[in-house]
Amino acid sequence: MKIATVSVLLPLALCLIQDAASKNEDQEMCHEFQAFMKNGKLFCPQDKKFFQSLDGIMFINKCATCKMILEKEAKSQKRARHLARAPKATAPTELNCDDFKKGERDGDFICPDYYEAVCGTDGKTYDNRCALCAENAKTGSQIGVKSEGECKSSNPEQDVCSAFRPFVRDGRLGCTRENDPVLGPDGKTHGNKCAMCAELFLKEAENAKREGETRIRRNAEKDFCKEYEKQVRNGRLFCTRESDPVRGPDGRMHGNKCALCAEIFKQRFSEENSKTDQNLGKAEEKTKVKREIVKLCSQYQNQAKNGILFCTRENDPIRGPDGKMHGNLCSMCQAYFQAENEEKKKAEARARNKRESGKATSYAELCSEYRKLVRNGKLACTRENDPIQGPDGKVHGNTCSMCEVFFQAEEEEKKKKEGKSRNKRQSKSTASFEELCSEYRKSRKNGRLFCTRENDPIQGPDGKMHGNTCSMCEAFFQQEERARAKAKREAAKEICSEFRDQVRNGTLICTREHNPVRGPDGKMHGNKCAMCASVFKLEEEEKKNDKEEKGKVEAEKVKREAVQELCSEYRHYVRNGRLPCTRENDPIEGLDGKIHGNTCSMCEAFFQQEAKEKERAEPRAKVKREAEKETCDEFRRLLQNGKLFCTRENDPVRGPDGKTHGNKCAMCKAVFQKENEERKRKEEEDQRNAAGHGSSGGGGGNTQDECAEYREQMKNGRLSCTRESDPVRDADGKSYNNQCTMCKAKLEREAERKNEYSRSRSNGTGSESGKDTCDEFRSQMKNGKLICTRESDPVRGPDGKTHGNKCTMCKEKLEREAAEKKKKEDEDRSNTGERSNTGERSNDKEDLCREFRSMQRNGKLICTRENNPVRGPYGKMHINKCAMCQSIFDREANERKKKDEEKSSSKPSNNAKDECSEFRNYIRNNELICPRENDPVHGADGKFYTNKCYMCRAVFLTEALERAKLQEKPSHVRASQEEDSPDSFSSLDSEMCKDYRVLPRIGYLCPKDLKPVCGDDGQTYNNPCMLCHENLIRQTNTHIRSTGKCEESSTPGTTAASMPPSDE
């Protein structure tokens, strides 16, 4: 029997030795490819030049074999790490509390004073096992021993967020928007505890990912450069200049393997030096701080006993070494002595190094009593708070909830095993998906496969169930195409990374070296650089197209805004979706690209287009509302007085408004509140419309109905309300905590109004009461104006008019008074005596603030908060003299600014004239003919014109009308105006042109008689009226040189009448 066992064991041993030897050989063979591993995968080059030589083919074959070996090895290492990590997190040791003594009377544990740190399953560190047993007895909890020694992750963030860890998925935690502000460990204020923990979990996931990537990279670098480690001296490696290019893990090309390793060692050496410098700096800072604290606390050293120091409550704040603020020096020293005492205990515990190993509890045994209560794969649990750590390393609310998760994990494992076995069976019995779909590959047209609706369910490669084999193959082909396109993009990016730095304005300059390469688009290129140039060009074109699309969208937006502004004046005339327009011919291009007869018809088309867009949008909104109603039908019957009461169950749901709510009930509550607000808003609008048509404002009835139940509870003008949170919005849009607080504010306002009315009646005169009521707003006046809110609180003024609120009633009165007061002051200043007085005052002000003028920086004066009240020259009290001078300087600056603005506004602006100078030469027969080009322009009169030419035509027309009005005025008035204004256009003799009639838009109406006159410009005019007309139209200043025709020596040019003469 023994001989038989030996004969069986020998072949097994030989097999194992051969496997180990082959593994070592594989590692040595694939050693050079380990540095190119990324995320457990190896990508081999697919360049065509490798296939042209025998060495290249051997290299690719070697890479392909190493790819399989290294990827398999990476998977096994990953699995081993996962298995090694699992028992650490999921194997808490047993806690036996029978070994410790209990008190005879109270039954509490009597614990020794030694320090043997133990980490509990709740994540906290306890001094020893006895202390943990005492805590269990005190709180009635069942905390076990997670591990010996201090907890590695006992930082406050994880302890605070332990309740949320079971709900984390891939580092993300879904939270509600509950408003319960919490200050996080990073010093930021978060909306609630869940939001704070979600941010912390995200940071943890990012840090873990970063650490894993750096660890993998470092291991690969270490294995790659193992042969050069002994040659490194002080972080430097000396290499030859042998040309054997190697790509490093950072994507850069190096001269050879040694050069790459030299850079890696240099970087590692610099990082280690910086770390040691940081650690030395921190240690020096700690010792320095400790030395200072020892000096400060030396006086209290003798008073401390066993690390305890008794202090008074004297308030003299000081910051301790831990960064916290302490009440006084004694309390800071007390904290320091306690910390020192704890450190001593820990050091003694480490020196003793006593450890006990406990046995892990079996979760299957712990959850055996709950297994009978499982129904349809679910276990119904209470919300009892008894934290326990589960097999997944997370802390659960109680044993029942932990067992529920344990059963779910068991079910998932069973399903996975069944799936694996089913897949094995399918792989044995059925062909692969490629073979299955090979017959459908020929039937594809333009990348699509047309299938029937035959019902023959089959599971596809994506794990989904498809109606039949054809539809499954269509999904399979689409998946293949996506994977192929993605691989091409990634390959192109990786191949062309070395050329990306050489790109300038989307172009890459290449040599004409002939080394054909196939690009990701399937075309052949002259060399690798030319292929990358085409890739970069395509990228640049895509970016350009995106920019053009964005530009088009922005241009359409600007055009739409211009059309809306242009059509705003016509919007009031729309009736039943139609706009009545004239047939005036003034062509303009609309937003739809069509040419319309005039602006009015264009606006009509624009309004119709808007109405159609609204009609299209309405069904979507209606469908959305109906969907909301259907989802919330089950909760509608639970409404009580328009309110819905919900539990705090955590089952996040996204509502129709895009917000995430705690559960479905909370979402429906928000929907009902929105419906109520819309209903109230409509009712208020109807009431306002009714009040506008009626003689008196009818807003009181609704408020009385709303607050009828609270009106009876009002006693002595006061109403007491609870703090119930049920937000309500009143008619003026103001939010209140609940309906009671809203009604309280309304009823108090009504009571104040009644008191004011009774007071005004008792006084007898409305004017006096008006003065009293508006006194509170006098202090709010700025530069003679009062700014009011739009609060709806109707008040009847002393003149009998109804105003929106008290402020608007007083605004007219106070602004009128301020204007009258300013007018009087201006009249007084015009007198010489007043001027001298004001000059003396300003001199006094300057004398007062002379010492502070030199201290101004950029027109500002920086003052301290010294309390030394001073009354300023305008009667206002200031905190000190500097603050008074600051207000004086501000006032002076404002006055200077106003004067500059008045000066600039008083000067006549000839901008419009200057802009239209280019069009003056094109005026023919007193008219300017403009093209129909659509280029909207904003004129100086605030109107929009089709283009610049139309704007200038309007400017010339207004100028002609102004000149015509000047001509119609009496001679003495016109002469005085011409003397005063240097820019006058006509300086003709008033007696010459006054007898002729002027028509607007036409000019002078001249007779047909022939009385030639010679102008000083050398031209002959039919009569003096024609000379006046030419001066008006051409804006010249021609005088009569002589009667009769001009001499033959001068170039006579008898002007034809630019307008039809009259029949007179």
From Swiss-Prot:
Residue ranges of domain Kazal-like in the record: 28-66, 91-153, 155-216, 219-285, 291-352, 361-423, 431-489, 490-551, 561-622, 626-688, 701-757, 768-830, 843-905, 910-971, 987-1048
Entry comment describing in which tissues the protein is expressed: Highly expressed in the thymus and stratum corneum. Also found in the oral mucosa, parathyroid gland, Bartholin's glands, tonsils, and vaginal epithelium. Very low levels are detected in lung, kidney, and prostate.
UniProt-annotated stretches for the region Disordered: 676-705, 751-775, 818-849, 895-915, 967-987, 1041-1064
Domain of life: Eukaryota
Location of the protein in the cell: Secreted
Medical condition linked: Netherton syndrome: An autosomal recessive congenital ichthyosis associated with hair shaft abnormalities and anomalies of the immune system. Typical features are ichthyosis linearis circumflexa, ichthyosiform erythroderma, trichorrhexis invaginata (bamboo hair), atopic dermatitis, and hayfever. High postnatal mortality is due to failure to thrive, infections and hypernatremic dehydration.
Job of this protein: Serine protease inhibitor, probably important for the anti-inflammatory and/or antimicrobial protection of mucous epithelia. Contribute to the integrity and protective barrier function of the skin by regulating the activity of defense-activating and desquamation-involved proteases. Inhibits KLK5, it's major target, in a pH-dependent manner. Inhibits KLK7, KLK14 CASP14, and trypsin.
Name the record gives this protein: Serine protease inhibitor Kazal-type 5
